[in-house]
Amino acid sequence: MAITAAQINELRKATGAGMLDCKKALEQNDGDFEKSVDYLRTKGLAAAAKKSSRAATEGMVAAFVSDDLKSGVLLEINSETDFVAKNDLFKAFVNNIGQHILSTSPADRDAMLAQPYSGDPSKTVQSYLNESISVIGENIQIRRFSRFDVQGDGCIGAYIHAGGKIGVMVQVESPAVTSANQETITTLVKDVAMHSAAAAPRYVTREQVPADVLEREKDIYRAKARETGKPDNIIEKIIVGQINKFYGDICLNEQVYVKDTDKTIPQVLKEASAAAGGTIGISRFERFVLGEGLEKKESDFAAEVAAAAGLK
C-alpha cells in the first residue's frame, strides 16, 4: 500500500524515530500504526509510543468532587478551537455538565444526553448542548466522563493540569478517613493525582496488566535481544529485568514518586498511613488527556490558496 506523508509524520511524532525509519516501518507493516511502533521498538529505534502523543483537539478536561468526597466525576468536553475553550461561556457549560453528572449519576454518555437537564428540567441535556452550540457559535462535543462512588471507607480526589489539558481522579480506601485526618488524606490523594498526571500510569498494580499487553512487551524484548546473538537462556533472564522495568513505568504502585524521586508511591502511602493512623490504599484512578486518540484536522494554507486560484 502507498504510505502517506501524514502517516510518516504521525509515527515520527509518536516515536521520535527518523523519517526514513518511520517510512520503512510503515511499509513493512502495511501502514498499521501499532505494528509499526512495535517494529521500531524491536529495532531499538523508538521508545514505547504514548497514545497521548497522538492527541490533537481543543476543549477542556475538568473534575468535580462532592463535598463529602464520596463521589467524583472526570469529564472531557471538546471544542473546535482553543479560543472557544478559554471562553467563559464554554467554561460555564463544562461546569454545568459536570455538576449535572455529579448530581444525577447517568449510566453513560447517551443516557446522560437523554436526561432532563438538572439546571432546567424542561429541556434535555441534548437540548441544552444544542442551545450552547448556537450561543457559543462553535461545535461542542461532550466526549466522555468517568464517575467514581465510594461505597465504604475512603475518599476521592482530583487534579487538573495546565488549565484542563490533563485530568486525573483518584479513589483511595482507608478506615482512617475521618474528619480529624481529612486534610492528611485529601492532600495525599491530590498528590497522587498530580503524580499520575505527570507519570502517566496505566494500571494500579501489575496484576491488572492484561496478559496480551504483557506478551506483546515480552515479544518486543525477545526479538530485540535475539539480534544481539545472545543464547535463549540469557535472553529470558534479560526479559525478566525488562518486564520489571516495564511494570515500574506503567503501574502506579511501582512508580518512583515524581515530587520526591527518593521515594516510591508505596513509600508515600506508607508514610501517609502512619500519619493518619490507618492503612491507605489506592483502589483506582482515571486519567484523561485532552483529545487523546482524536486527530485534529490540519489545513495546508498554501495548498488551499493554490487550489482556490486554480493552481496545482
From Swiss-Prot:
Statement: the UniProt record of this protein carries the keyword Cytoplasm: yes
Positions of the UniProt region annotated as Involved in Mg(2+) ion dislocation from EF-Tu: 81-84
Main subcellular location: cytoplasm
One of the Pfam families matching this protein, by short name: EF_TS
Matches recorded under Gene3D superfamilies: 1.10.286.20, DNA helicase RuvA subunit, C-terminal domain, Elongation factor Ts, dimerisation domain
Its biological purpose: Associates with the EF-Tu.GDP complex and induces the exchange of GDP to GTP. It remains bound to the aminoacyl-tRNA.EF-Tu.GTP complex up to the GTP hydrolysis stage on the ribosome.
Annotated protein name in UniProt: Elongation factor Ts
Gene expressing this chain: tsf
